[in-house]
Amino acid sequence: MAKFLEYQGKEWLAKGGMPVPKGRVASSPEEAEEVARWIGGPVAVKGQVQAGGRGKAGIVKLADTPEQAKALAKEILSKTVQGLPVKQVLVEEKLDIKKEYYCSFVVNNSREARSPMLMFSAEGGMDIESVDESLLFKFNIDPMYGLRSYDAVDICAKAGIAPEDLSKFASFLTKLSALYKKYDCQMLEINQIGRAHV
Protein backbone atom coordinates (compact mmCIF):
# COMPACT_ATOMS: atom_id res chain seq x y z
CA MET A 1 0.00 0.00 0.00
CA ALA A 2 1.51 3.33 -1.09
CA LYS A 3 1.62 6.22 1.36
CA PHE A 4 1.97 9.69 -0.08
CA LEU A 5 3.97 12.61 1.19
CA GLU A 6 2.04 15.89 1.11
CA TYR A 7 3.48 17.05 -2.21
CA GLN A 8 2.71 13.67 -3.83
CA GLY A 9 -0.84 13.80 -2.53
CA LYS A 10 -1.30 17.30 -3.93
CA GLU A 11 0.06 16.26 -7.33
CA TRP A 12 -2.43 13.38 -7.32
CA LEU A 13 -5.31 15.67 -6.31
CA ALA A 14 -4.38 18.21 -9.00
CA LYS A 15 -4.46 15.47 -11.66
CA GLY A 16 -7.95 14.65 -10.41
CA GLY A 17 -9.07 18.24 -11.00
CA MET A 18 -8.93 19.41 -7.38
CA PRO A 19 -7.64 22.92 -6.53
CA VAL A 20 -4.22 22.96 -4.82
CA PRO A 21 -1.79 25.82 -4.06
CA LYS A 22 0.94 26.62 -6.58
CA GLY A 23 4.17 24.98 -5.47
CA ARG A 24 7.02 22.55 -6.04
CA VAL A 25 9.15 20.19 -3.98
CA ALA A 26 12.81 21.04 -3.25
CA SER A 27 15.68 18.91 -1.94
CA SER A 28 18.09 21.73 -1.07
CA PRO A 29 17.98 25.31 0.26
CA GLU A 30 19.04 26.56 -3.18
CA GLU A 31 16.16 24.74 -4.88
CA ALA A 32 13.75 26.13 -2.28
CA GLU A 33 14.96 29.66 -3.07
CA GLU A 34 14.46 28.98 -6.79
CA VAL A 35 10.89 27.75 -6.27
CA ALA A 36 10.04 30.74 -4.05
CA ARG A 37 11.35 33.07 -6.77
CA TRP A 38 9.21 31.26 -9.34
CA ILE A 39 6.11 31.62 -7.14
CA GLY A 40 6.81 35.32 -6.75
CA GLY A 41 5.36 36.12 -3.32
CA PRO A 42 5.16 34.92 0.29
CA VAL A 43 5.47 31.13 0.60
CA ALA A 44 5.07 28.27 3.03
CA VAL A 45 8.10 25.98 3.44
CA LYS A 46 6.90 22.56 4.61
CA GLY A 47 9.07 19.61 5.58
CA GLN A 48 8.02 16.38 3.87
CA VAL A 49 7.88 13.35 6.17
CA GLN A 50 5.21 10.72 6.76
CA ALA A 51 4.43 11.92 10.25
CA GLY A 52 1.69 13.91 11.91
CA GLY A 53 2.17 17.09 13.90
CA ARG A 54 4.58 18.70 11.45
CA GLY A 55 3.53 22.21 12.42
CA LYS A 56 4.17 21.54 16.09
CA ALA A 57 7.50 19.88 15.19
CA GLY A 58 8.63 23.16 13.63
CA ILE A 59 8.97 21.98 10.04
CA VAL A 60 6.24 24.18 8.57
CA LYS A 61 7.31 27.83 8.29
CA LEU A 62 6.36 30.98 6.38
CA ALA A 63 8.74 33.10 4.32
CA ASP A 64 8.22 36.53 2.75
CA THR A 65 11.22 36.41 0.41
CA PRO A 66 13.17 33.78 -1.57
CA GLU A 67 16.16 34.40 0.72
CA GLN A 68 14.04 33.64 3.79
CA ALA A 69 12.73 30.50 2.09
CA LYS A 70 16.31 29.36 1.51
CA ALA A 71 17.27 29.94 5.15
CA LEU A 72 14.15 28.17 6.45
CA ALA A 73 14.67 25.23 4.09
CA LYS A 74 18.23 24.86 5.39
CA GLU A 75 16.90 24.75 8.96
CA ILE A 76 14.04 22.34 8.18
CA LEU A 77 16.21 19.97 6.12
CA SER A 78 18.51 19.52 9.13
CA LYS A 79 15.67 18.19 11.31
CA THR A 80 14.36 14.75 12.21
CA VAL A 81 10.70 14.16 13.09
CA GLN A 82 9.62 10.98 14.87
CA GLY A 83 12.89 9.38 13.83
CA LEU A 84 12.45 10.38 10.18
CA PRO A 85 14.98 12.73 8.56
CA VAL A 86 13.50 15.59 6.52
CA LYS A 87 14.93 15.18 3.01
CA GLN A 88 12.59 17.44 1.05
CA VAL A 89 10.50 20.56 1.52
CA LEU A 90 7.37 21.62 -0.30
CA VAL A 91 7.54 25.31 -1.17
CA GLU A 92 4.11 26.64 -2.06
CA GLU A 93 2.27 29.92 -2.26
CA LYS A 94 1.07 31.26 1.08
CA LEU A 95 -2.70 31.49 1.11
CA ASP A 96 -4.69 33.83 3.32
CA ILE A 97 -6.76 31.08 4.95
CA LYS A 98 -9.94 32.37 6.60
CA LYS A 99 -11.39 29.01 7.65
CA GLU A 100 -10.12 25.43 7.97
CA TYR A 101 -12.03 22.19 7.43
CA TYR A 102 -11.24 18.50 7.87
CA CYS A 103 -12.18 15.64 5.58
CA SER A 104 -11.27 11.96 5.37
CA PHE A 105 -12.48 8.86 3.61
CA VAL A 106 -11.65 5.57 5.34
CA VAL A 107 -12.77 1.95 5.23
CA ASN A 108 -15.31 1.33 7.98
CA ASN A 109 -14.59 -2.25 9.06
CA SER A 110 -17.35 -2.51 11.65
CA ARG A 111 -19.50 -5.63 11.38
CA GLU A 112 -22.62 -3.55 10.68
CA ALA A 113 -21.14 -1.44 7.88
CA ARG A 114 -18.01 -2.71 6.04
CA SER A 115 -18.17 0.24 3.68
CA PRO A 116 -16.30 3.46 2.90
CA MET A 117 -16.97 6.19 5.45
CA LEU A 118 -16.73 9.95 5.08
CA MET A 119 -15.71 12.03 8.09
CA PHE A 120 -16.12 15.79 7.76
CA SER A 121 -15.74 18.69 10.16
CA ALA A 122 -15.85 22.47 9.90
CA GLU A 123 -13.16 22.49 12.62
CA GLY A 124 -10.00 21.43 10.77
CA GLY A 125 -6.42 22.39 11.56
CA MET A 126 -3.46 21.28 13.64
CA ASP A 127 -5.52 20.02 16.58
CA ILE A 128 -8.12 17.89 14.79
CA GLU A 129 -7.46 15.09 17.31
CA SER A 130 -8.82 17.29 20.08
CA VAL A 131 -11.98 18.37 18.23
CA ASP A 132 -15.16 17.37 20.05
CA GLU A 133 -16.67 14.18 18.62
CA SER A 134 -19.98 15.98 18.13
CA LEU A 135 -18.31 18.27 15.56
CA LEU A 136 -16.99 15.38 13.44
CA PHE A 137 -19.76 14.17 11.15
CA LYS A 138 -19.63 10.61 9.79
CA PHE A 139 -21.46 9.03 6.89
CA ASN A 140 -21.29 5.45 5.54
CA ILE A 141 -21.06 5.53 1.74
CA ASP A 142 -22.79 3.01 -0.50
CA PRO A 143 -19.85 1.19 -2.15
CA MET A 144 -21.81 0.72 -5.38
CA TYR A 145 -22.98 4.31 -5.93
CA GLY A 146 -20.35 6.31 -4.08
CA LEU A 147 -21.13 9.57 -2.29
CA ARG A 148 -24.28 11.02 -3.82
CA SER A 149 -24.72 14.77 -4.12
CA TYR A 150 -27.74 14.97 -1.82
CA ASP A 151 -25.91 13.02 0.89
CA ALA A 152 -22.91 15.34 0.57
CA VAL A 153 -25.21 18.37 0.88
CA ASP A 154 -26.82 16.83 3.97
CA ILE A 155 -23.53 16.17 5.78
CA CYS A 156 -22.24 19.66 4.91
CA ALA A 157 -25.43 21.21 6.27
CA LYS A 158 -25.11 19.21 9.50
CA ALA A 159 -21.51 20.41 9.83
CA GLY A 160 -22.68 24.01 9.70
CA ILE A 161 -21.75 25.01 6.15
CA ALA A 162 -23.72 28.11 5.12
CA PRO A 163 -26.67 27.43 2.76
CA GLU A 164 -25.13 29.49 -0.05
CA ASP A 165 -21.96 27.34 0.10
CA LEU A 166 -23.57 23.89 0.32
CA SER A 167 -23.43 23.18 -3.41
CA LYS A 168 -19.73 24.09 -3.68
CA PHE A 169 -18.69 22.01 -0.66
CA ALA A 170 -20.85 19.07 -1.69
CA SER A 171 -19.29 19.09 -5.17
CA PHE A 172 -15.81 19.10 -3.61
CA LEU A 173 -16.64 16.10 -1.40
CA THR A 174 -18.23 14.09 -4.21
CA LYS A 175 -15.15 14.64 -6.40
CA LEU A 176 -12.90 13.48 -3.56
CA SER A 177 -15.11 10.45 -3.03
CA ALA A 178 -14.83 9.57 -6.72
CA LEU A 179 -11.01 9.76 -6.53
CA TYR A 180 -11.03 7.62 -3.38
CA LYS A 181 -13.06 4.96 -5.19
CA LYS A 182 -11.24 5.20 -8.54
CA TYR A 183 -7.82 4.53 -7.00
CA ASP A 184 -9.07 1.99 -4.44
CA CYS A 185 -7.65 3.97 -1.50
CA GLN A 186 -7.58 2.63 2.04
CA MET A 187 -7.60 6.19 3.38
CA LEU A 188 -7.79 9.69 1.92
CA GLU A 189 -7.36 12.47 4.48
CA ILE A 190 -7.08 16.21 3.95
CA ASN A 191 -6.30 18.33 6.98
CA GLN A 192 -6.74 21.05 6.49
CA ILE A 193 -8.94 22.09 3.61
CA GLY A 194 -8.33 25.82 3.52
CA ARG A 195 -10.84 28.42 2.47
CA ALA A 196 -9.39 31.74 1.39
CA HIS A 197 -12.67 33.73 1.47
CA VAL A 198 -15.62 33.63 3.86
Regions found by a protein language model. Give the residues of each.
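A conserved helix-loop-beta module that forms one wall/lid of the active-site cleft
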Residues: 1-41
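ATP-grasp fold ATP-binding core
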Residues: 6-8, 12-13, 38-54, 83-97, ...
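Glycine-rich phosphate-binding loop of ATP-grasp-fold ATP-dependent ligases
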Residues: 20-23, 45-72, 102, 115, ...
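Active-site cofactor/substrate anionic-group-binding motifs, chiefly glycine-
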Residues: 38-44, 62-86, 123-126
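Hydrophobic alpha-helical hairpins/lids featuring a short glycine-rich hinge
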Residues: 82-140
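Cap/lid and interdomain-hinge subdomains that line or gate substrate/regulatory clefts
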Residues: 124-169
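A long amphipathic alpha-helix within ATP-dependent nucleotide-binding catalytic cores
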Residues: 151-193
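Conserved small/polar residues in nucleotide/adenosyl-binding loops
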Residues: 196-198
